[in-house]
Amino acid sequence: MKNKILNTVLISILLLVVVFFVSTNFIINVQWFKEVGYLNVFFTKLIAICKLFVPIFILYFCVIAIYLFTLRKSIRSLVGDTKFKSVKKYFLLSNLVISILGAGATATTQWYKILQFTNAVPFGEVDPIFNKDISFYVFKLPLVQSLFSTAISLIIILVLITVIIYLALGFKDKIYQNKDNVININSKTYGIRKFAGKQLAVLASVLSLLIGCSYLLKSYNLVYSTRGVSYGAGYTDVKITMIFYKVIAIACVISSIVVFISILKLKFRPIIISIASIAVLIVLEPVVAIFTQQFVVKPNEMELEKPYISYSIDATKKAFNIDEIEVKEMEPNENITSEKLEDNKDIIENLKVNSTGPLLSFYQQVQLIKNYYEFNDADTDRYNINGKYTQVFVSPREINREAMTTWQNKHLRYTHGYGLAMSRVNSVTEFGQPDFVMKDIPTVNTTDINLENPRIYFGESDNDYVIVNTEGGEFDYPTGDTENTFNYNGTGGLKMTPFNRVLFSIYERNPKILMSSSITSESRIILNRNIVKRVQEIAPFLTYDSDPYIVVHDGRLVWMMNAYTSTDKYPFSEPHEGVNYIRNSVKVVVDAFNGNVDFYVTDENDPIINCYLKIYKGLFKPLSEMPEDLKEHFRYPQDLFELQSKVLTKYHVDDPIKLFTEEDLWDRSLDVVKHGGENLSQGDEGKEESILNKAKENKNNEAENEGLYLMTKLPDEENVEMMLLDYFNMRGKQSMVALLGARMDGDNYGELVMYKFPPQRTIYSPILFKNRIQQDPNISKEISLWAGKGSEVIYGDIIIVPIEDSLLYLNTIYLKANSENSMPEMKRVILSNGDKIVIEENIEKALLKLFNYNSFEENKNSNKDETSNTEITSDNSGVKEAADLFNKAIEAQKNGDWATYGEFINKLGDVLNKMSHD
């Protein structure tokens, strides 16, 4: 008795341990979602699955039970009354298993479609073929098709159950009789028609009906057809395929009646005829469609397909939100004068002379401070700095987890990044280096931007956990040879209670979490620290932009992300990159210190986000609740902009005939590799190759020109604004035919503006401009000399900006010594307008040489506290002292003497501050 009780207790304990191990992931998810404030989002899925599972299980169980009940007489006849009761138990158990598995599979795969179906929001647009609202295709049709597939699967399961029962019981009965030498029952005399003829007749009829209905549903998929010259249903789809589908559906209905009657009457010929008729129709459809397409449509394709091409143009433009682009004609002239530049000097003052690649390389050499920091990316933003609207590069300084070798350093000691580097986009120092306004550790801030808490616990680095508030403290930042520590005082993370220590030891499969003496009950474990994975964990149904960016807000750092709603179910819209409808409907803000995540709805007209609002109550906030200063940092997402640019290469036209003849197809402008040293390393002008020809020969050197964030002013506008620009060429040619700009400041956010250029003229595109640079004898000679001396020549971004009715071209050249710790420095500026092109040391000299324009002296006198586009404007003695300190700091950095480096940098900061106040 005691042994029995002991065994029961041991088994119970073992079961509890197993359940605990299995449920660790669920328990942690519940705690984490509660911490971030979205526990209701986590349970939305679970509750939906549970709500669906119960009725679906009942449906499955009842259908199978009723079906088995109809077979009871046949089963009793096959096994006898004695064994029938025991067989019933197996049937009940089998029904339970099948129903649980079927309901579970259906609920876990269809819960989302059902929620979309029940919370559908109309688009207010209908497709041109069936006159159905777009919401039918996006929210409803996928569920209906899935349910029909499930119903067909259930019919097939019932047929399989019938066959398995018939074979299993009949075969078992035959073996049993032979083994015991009892009278042998010849199972062949009890055929399957007698066993389940009526049941199979019903199933076959229902299956035929379902197949017929599925063909009616299949008709709706024709709006995604790729058969014709445009995406969506074409002439053949509408006039041939759709009719065939209807005929097949009618044939299936007739067949269901024929099959039912024929099975009962044991007449197989009608069954064969009906099934053969359907098969012939199914086979005949593509044959007739191909014949029609080749011999009817092809000879008259333009006339027959014209309305369907129009449908595709309209749908694609609406779906990608490019149907309301403001298009302006522009015929660029070459008459930029000094007067015109003076009228547009705000454009000149904001010309982008820094490029992300060289700048990030410089940051990594000078601003990492220690090897356990890293800069993952440099983003472009704008701030009001000391009263002036200024575009800047911003790069957060995060912890480099790969530099950590021990568990304690990786998870307890080095827990957060510190501060950021910020420099002006439109200026460099006299050495061609970034003009910093925020730098170093602790942060040296020469702006009026308030940054009190520069710590980064959540960022773009890896997603591994850290444990804060430990006994040893966390490394904060270095000061010479000493290390300052910090104890986390934020709200992020889960408390390390004894229960949680056990839980996370199991979850992370690391006993150190349980055994470490540094971890106390006040310690917190911070999970999902990668901001992209963090927001994906909360809202996986959104698509996120690949480039989050950091913003200084209210004395701390926050991340801003663009999130998209998308689908591939928009009728007649041609898919690009897996979607054929997309909206940037959500802005996500993640606190870099606490990890708080807020989702703000920015497009209230998007039906998909309105559907999500109904499904996930409490997840999204209205835009009115976002702090106003954060709205000033909205960026038009580059991923979306480039996707729209790709779509516009084909769908910038409204005329279906132009799309059909492909007479006006575009390409996004090409750029070449920005490293020019390889091309010119021989230092021989005679051996230099045209970049255009070289790009044609080596496709690896070509790449689509990325959209650039620029601070500029559009023609007819009064103020400069940050914009995203992209350039287009005529397909197969390199002459530029259009410029696309996305506006993002204030009420203009989201507006797209396109300037079209006359196609009969040669307007220099980025690659043609780069080719001109290489072909100019003065420029190529200077570049060849640098390359011949062993320096690496790096080309910056090509900038093309409109100035009233003209185009100004800008390219910068960086030099980088061929040594391990060398840094790229901007050494030359190339400016061009029309056929004129010059290369000079800075913007001022280039403007003076090209246009005889010199207004920077006035700017220098009136803005002594600021750095000009390329030079520090202070007395020579101060500049010399600053240069000497900077060079000494760099030398100390190269030698790994970080204490000395810090001293020189601090002294340099004092000198610069003194210069700025003189």
Swiss-Prot record:
Transmembrane stretches, start-end: 8-28, 46-66, 91-111, 151-171, 200-220, 243-263, 271-291
Keyword entries, A-Z: Cell membrane, Membrane, Transmembrane, Transmembrane helix
Membrane-protein topology: Multi-pass membrane protein
GO cellular component: extracellular region; plasma membrane
Lipoprotein keyword on record: no
Cysteine disulfide partners in this protein: none
Matches recorded under InterPro entries: UPF0182
Subcellular location: Cell membrane
Top-level taxon: Bacteria
Similarity comment: Belongs to the UPF0182 family.
Annotated NCBIfam families: PRK00068.1 (NF000825)
Protein name per the record: UPF0182 protein CPR_0011
Organism: Clostridium perfringens (strain SM101 / Type A)
